[in-house]
Curated annotation (Swiss-Prot):
It comes from Polistes dominula (European paper wasp). This is Venom allergen 5. The lineage of its organism: Eukaryota, Metazoa, Ecdysozoa, Arthropoda, Hexapoda. Its main location: secreted. Disulfide bonds join C25-C37, C29-C125, C49-C117, C193-C210. Residues 69-212 form the SCP domain. Keywords: Allergen, Disulfide bond, Secreted, Signal. One of its GO terms (cellular component) is extracellular region. It comes from the Eukaryota.
């Protein structure tokens, strides 16, 4: 009887797990199949990671905290009108800049994609039932240490030097400013990130993918409401 119940429990848990994965298959994107539908929920590095000596999968609890803190530090700097850089600068103050909070579902989807080792490539569909989801990717390496998550996020922040608030996002400038504009998109509320740290060709690489809900970077829309 105990064995039968144990088997039943395993079957039920398996069905629940499969149904969760199948839910993502119901989420449709015009650009393609959802990441979790295509690859499942495993965050184990895929065969595409061959040749990379994986040291860690996913951000630590401390790194999660730092990711949220760095996003909000920079968002509030911009919101208060203290960001002097730009093309031209300074950036105007904002009246609708939310403080971001961590979202585990966004992080899970980001980690599934990061673990495919499709380096610096965006996945085709990462939405949730709640959100259209935006994405930023960063990659940096050093010969003697893994670059910090803060350093990676600052790569996105530094794109502000090329941004003109009055022009906004265009097809022409998106490649230069799109990470910055997603970082400070006023209506975005939540962030969740996946990461890999690995050694390749004697370099210590830190690869970071952050998903944002709701997404930003809509052409023709201001990145935030100017105060």
């Amino acid at each position: 009887m105990k064995i039968s119940c144990l088997i039943c429990l395993v079957i039920v848990l398996t069905i629940i797990h499969l149904s969760q994965a199948n839910d993502y298959c119901k989420i449709k994107c015009s650009s393609g199949v959802h990441t979790v539908c295509q690859y499942g929920e495993s965050t184990k590095p895929s065969k595409n990671c061959a040749g990379k000596l994986i040291k860690s999968v996913g951000p630590t609890e401390e790194e999660k905290k730092l990711i949220v803190e760095e996003h909000n530090r920079f968002r509030q700097k911009v919101a208060k009108g203290l960001e002097t850089r730009g093309n031209p600068g300074p950036q105007p103050a904002a009246s609708n800049m939310n403080n971001l909070v961590w979202n585990d579902e966004l992080a899970k989807i980001a980690q599934v994609w990061a673990s495919q080792c499709q380096i610096l490539v965006h996945d085709k569909c990462r939405n949730t039932e709640k959100y259209q989801v935006g994405q930023n990717i960063a990659y940096a390496g050093s010969s003697n240490h893994f670059p910090s998550v803060t350093k990676l996020i600052q790569l996105w922040e530094n794109e502000v030097k090329d941004f003109n608030y009055n022009t906004g996002i265009t097809n022409k400038n998106f490649g230069k400013v799109g990470h910055y504009t997603q970082m400070v998109w006023g209506n975005t509320k939540e962030v969740g990130c996946g990461s890999l740290k690995y050694v390749e060709k004697n370099m210590q690489i830190h690869y970071l993918i952050c998903n944002y809900g709701p997404a930003g970077n809509y052409l023709g829309q201001p990145i935030y409401t100017k105060k």
